A protein has these predicted regions:
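Gly/Pro-enriched, hydrophobic low-complexity segments
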Residues: 135-215
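Extended lipid/amphipathic-ligand handling interfaces
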Residues: 66-69, 90-92, 166-170
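An acidic-aromatic
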Residues: 74-124
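Bacterial Sec signal peptide processing site at the extreme N-terminus
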Residues: 20-40
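Sec-dependent bacterial lipoprotein signal peptides
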Residues: 1-24
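Post-signal-peptide N-terminal segment of Sec-exported extracytoplasmic proteins
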Residues: 42-76, 80, 87
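Envelope-exposed proteins and targeting segments
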Residues: 45, 64, 73, 86, ...
Protein backbone atom coordinates (compact mmCIF):
# COMPACT_ATOMS: atom_id res chain seq x y z
CA UNK A 1 0.00 0.00 0.00
CA UNK A 2 1.51 3.34 -1.07
CA UNK A 3 1.32 6.14 1.40
CA UNK A 4 0.82 9.45 -0.43
CA UNK A 5 3.46 12.06 0.32
CA UNK A 6 2.12 15.08 2.19
CA UNK A 7 1.54 18.23 0.13
CA UNK A 8 2.88 21.40 1.77
CA UNK A 9 1.08 24.67 1.19
CA UNK A 10 2.73 27.78 2.64
CA UNK A 11 0.52 29.88 4.84
CA UNK A 12 0.00 33.63 4.42
CA UNK A 13 2.69 34.47 7.01
CA UNK A 14 5.29 32.43 5.14
CA UNK A 15 4.47 34.24 1.90
CA UNK A 16 4.78 37.63 3.58
CA UNK A 17 8.16 36.62 5.02
CA UNK A 18 9.36 35.52 1.57
CA UNK A 19 8.31 38.83 0.02
CA UNK A 20 10.06 40.80 2.77
CA UNK A 21 13.30 38.86 2.31
CA UNK A 22 13.16 39.40 -1.45
CA UNK A 23 12.68 43.15 -0.99
CA UNK A 24 15.62 43.35 1.41
CA UNK A 25 17.86 41.47 -1.01
CA UNK A 26 17.17 43.94 -3.83
CA UNK A 27 19.11 47.24 -3.44
CA UNK A 28 17.21 50.44 -4.18
CA UNK A 29 17.62 51.49 -7.79
CA UNK A 30 19.36 54.73 -8.65
CA UNK A 31 18.62 56.54 -11.85
CA UNK A 32 21.32 56.55 -14.50
CA UNK A 33 23.58 59.55 -14.89
CA UNK A 34 23.06 61.62 -18.03
CA UNK A 35 25.05 60.69 -21.11
CA UNK A 36 26.75 62.97 -23.62
CA UNK A 37 23.82 62.32 -25.95
CA UNK A 38 21.37 63.40 -23.25
CA UNK A 39 23.24 66.65 -22.66
CA UNK A 40 23.20 67.45 -26.37
CA UNK A 41 19.41 67.36 -26.45
CA UNK A 42 17.38 70.58 -26.07
CA UNK A 43 15.84 69.09 -22.95
CA UNK A 44 19.11 69.55 -21.04
CA UNK A 45 20.70 72.50 -22.85
CA UNK A 46 19.48 74.97 -20.20
CA UNK A 47 20.34 74.35 -16.56
CA UNK A 48 21.32 76.06 -13.33
CA UNK A 49 23.03 75.01 -10.12
CA UNK A 50 23.36 76.79 -6.79
CA UNK A 51 25.84 75.63 -4.22
CA UNK A 52 29.28 76.09 -2.69
CA UNK A 53 32.85 75.58 -3.81
CA UNK A 54 36.10 75.44 -1.85
CA UNK A 55 39.73 75.26 -2.93
CA UNK A 56 42.59 74.07 -0.74
CA UNK A 57 46.29 74.08 -1.59
CA UNK A 58 48.69 73.38 1.24
CA UNK A 59 47.78 75.66 4.14
CA UNK A 60 45.92 78.11 1.91
CA UNK A 61 42.32 78.01 0.77
CA UNK A 62 39.09 79.86 0.10
CA UNK A 63 35.44 79.09 -0.28
CA UNK A 64 32.56 80.82 -2.03
CA UNK A 65 28.89 80.47 -2.83
CA UNK A 66 28.24 79.55 -6.43
CA UNK A 67 25.50 80.23 -8.97
CA UNK A 68 26.06 78.71 -12.41
CA UNK A 69 23.69 79.06 -15.36
CA UNK A 70 24.01 77.57 -18.82
CA UNK A 71 21.76 78.48 -21.74
CA UNK A 72 22.42 76.57 -24.96
CA UNK A 73 26.20 76.86 -24.85
CA UNK A 74 26.45 80.22 -23.09
CA UNK A 75 27.27 80.16 -19.40
CA UNK A 76 27.47 82.55 -16.47
CA UNK A 77 29.24 81.76 -13.22
CA UNK A 78 28.82 83.96 -10.14
CA UNK A 79 31.18 83.39 -7.22
CA UNK A 80 30.44 85.35 -4.06
CA UNK A 81 33.12 85.82 -1.43
CA UNK A 82 36.32 84.41 -2.98
CA UNK A 83 39.70 85.84 -1.98
CA UNK A 84 38.06 88.75 -0.17
CA UNK A 85 37.05 90.33 -3.50
CA UNK A 86 33.34 90.32 -2.68
CA UNK A 87 32.28 88.61 -5.90
CA UNK A 88 33.35 87.78 -9.42
CA UNK A 89 31.33 86.96 -12.50
CA UNK A 90 32.49 84.83 -15.40
CA UNK A 91 30.55 84.80 -18.68
CA UNK A 92 31.54 82.78 -21.70
CA UNK A 93 30.72 80.84 -24.83
CA UNK A 94 32.61 79.20 -27.68
CA UNK A 95 34.05 82.59 -28.74
CA UNK A 96 35.70 83.49 -25.44
CA UNK A 97 35.17 84.50 -21.83
CA UNK A 98 34.79 87.70 -19.79
CA UNK A 99 35.52 88.10 -16.08
CA UNK A 100 34.17 90.99 -14.02
CA UNK A 101 35.29 91.77 -10.46
CA UNK A 102 33.27 93.51 -7.77
CA UNK A 103 35.35 96.69 -8.12
CA UNK A 104 34.35 97.02 -11.77
CA UNK A 105 37.42 95.63 -13.55
CA UNK A 106 36.76 93.64 -16.73
CA UNK A 107 39.07 91.03 -18.23
CA UNK A 108 38.62 89.22 -21.54
CA UNK A 109 40.34 86.08 -22.81
CA UNK A 110 39.79 82.99 -24.93
CA UNK A 111 40.46 80.47 -22.15
CA UNK A 112 38.37 80.55 -18.96
CA UNK A 113 40.78 78.50 -16.84
CA UNK A 114 43.76 80.69 -17.73
CA UNK A 115 41.78 83.88 -17.09
CA UNK A 116 40.63 82.79 -13.63
CA UNK A 117 44.18 81.80 -12.74
CA UNK A 118 45.60 85.11 -13.97
CA UNK A 119 43.08 87.27 -12.09
CA UNK A 120 42.58 85.31 -8.85
CA UNK A 121 45.77 83.27 -8.62
CA UNK A 122 43.76 80.07 -8.20
CA UNK A 123 43.39 77.13 -10.55
CA UNK A 124 39.70 76.45 -11.14
CA UNK A 125 38.94 74.14 -14.10
CA UNK A 126 35.87 75.99 -15.36
CA UNK A 127 35.94 74.38 -18.82
CA UNK A 128 35.97 70.92 -17.27
CA UNK A 129 33.48 71.54 -14.48
CA UNK A 130 30.86 72.56 -17.06
CA UNK A 131 30.70 68.87 -18.02
CA UNK A 132 31.97 67.08 -14.90
CA UNK A 133 29.25 68.62 -12.74
CA UNK A 134 26.76 66.88 -15.05
CA UNK A 135 28.55 63.55 -14.75
CA UNK A 136 30.16 63.33 -18.19
CA UNK A 137 33.69 63.91 -19.57
CA UNK A 138 34.55 66.91 -21.71
CA UNK A 139 33.84 65.83 -25.31
CA UNK A 140 36.83 65.17 -27.54
CA UNK A 141 39.35 64.68 -24.71
CA UNK A 142 40.72 61.36 -23.40
CA UNK A 143 39.09 60.28 -20.14
CA UNK A 144 38.92 57.31 -17.80
CA UNK A 145 35.44 56.71 -16.39
CA UNK A 146 34.79 54.28 -13.52
CA UNK A 147 31.41 52.88 -12.53
CA UNK A 148 30.26 50.44 -9.88
CA UNK A 149 28.83 46.96 -10.51
CA UNK A 150 25.42 48.47 -11.22
CA UNK A 151 26.81 50.92 -13.77
CA UNK A 152 26.57 54.00 -11.55
CA UNK A 153 29.22 56.68 -11.98
CA UNK A 154 31.94 56.62 -9.31
CA UNK A 155 34.80 58.69 -10.72
CA UNK A 156 36.44 60.00 -13.86
CA UNK A 157 39.90 61.24 -14.71
CA UNK A 158 40.55 63.81 -17.43
CA UNK A 159 42.99 66.59 -18.30
CA UNK A 160 45.11 65.92 -15.22
CA UNK A 161 42.16 66.03 -12.82
CA UNK A 162 40.67 63.20 -10.78
CA UNK A 163 36.97 63.66 -10.05
CA UNK A 164 35.24 61.65 -7.34
CA UNK A 165 31.43 61.60 -7.11
CA UNK A 166 30.00 61.17 -3.63
CA UNK A 167 26.31 62.04 -3.96
CA UNK A 168 23.57 62.41 -6.58
CA UNK A 169 20.08 63.87 -6.84
CA UNK A 170 17.27 62.56 -9.01
CA UNK A 171 15.98 65.33 -11.28
CA UNK A 172 13.78 64.66 -14.29
CA UNK A 173 14.50 60.94 -14.20
CA UNK A 174 18.29 61.30 -14.17
CA UNK A 175 20.93 61.25 -11.44
CA UNK A 176 22.73 64.61 -11.25
CA UNK A 177 25.86 65.05 -9.10
CA UNK A 178 25.44 67.09 -5.92
CA UNK A 179 28.75 66.42 -4.16
CA UNK A 180 32.09 65.94 -5.89
CA UNK A 181 35.79 66.32 -5.19
CA UNK A 182 38.38 67.31 -7.79
CA UNK A 183 42.11 66.85 -7.20
CA UNK A 184 45.25 67.58 -9.17
CA UNK A 185 48.77 67.57 -7.73
CA UNK A 186 48.44 69.31 -4.33
CA UNK A 187 45.21 71.19 -5.14
CA UNK A 188 41.79 70.00 -3.96
CA UNK A 189 38.45 71.43 -5.09
CA UNK A 190 35.18 70.48 -3.40
CA UNK A 191 31.85 71.27 -5.01
CA UNK A 192 28.49 70.92 -3.27
CA UNK A 193 25.30 71.52 -5.25
CA UNK A 194 22.29 72.53 -3.17
CA UNK A 195 19.86 73.02 -6.07
CA UNK A 196 19.66 71.54 -9.57
CA UNK A 197 17.32 73.33 -11.98
CA UNK A 198 16.72 72.03 -15.50
CA UNK A 199 15.20 74.29 -18.13
CA UNK A 200 15.04 78.08 -18.14
CA UNK A 201 16.19 79.71 -14.90
CA UNK A 202 13.70 81.79 -12.91
CA UNK A 203 13.81 85.56 -13.32
CA UNK A 204 15.05 86.07 -9.76
CA UNK A 205 18.17 84.04 -10.53
CA UNK A 206 18.76 85.81 -13.81
CA UNK A 207 18.82 89.18 -12.09
CA UNK A 208 21.56 88.17 -9.63
CA UNK A 209 24.30 90.74 -10.28
CA UNK A 210 27.85 91.18 -9.09
CA UNK A 211 27.73 93.34 -5.99
CA UNK A 212 30.11 96.18 -5.32
CA UNK A 213 32.16 96.12 -2.13
CA UNK A 214 30.77 98.01 0.83
CA UNK A 215 32.30 101.46 1.39
Amino acid sequence: MRIPSPHYSPGPYALLLLLALTACATPPAREASPTALDLASPRYSNWQIRGRVSLVKGDQGWHASLNWREDAGRYRLDLSGPLGQGAIRLEGDAAGVRLQTADGHDYVAEDADALVLAVTGWQLPVAGIRYWVRGVPVPGRPAVVKTDAAGHLVSLAQSGWDIRYDRFQDVDGRAWPTRMRLTTDDLSVRLVVDDWILGSAPASAASNAVSAPSP
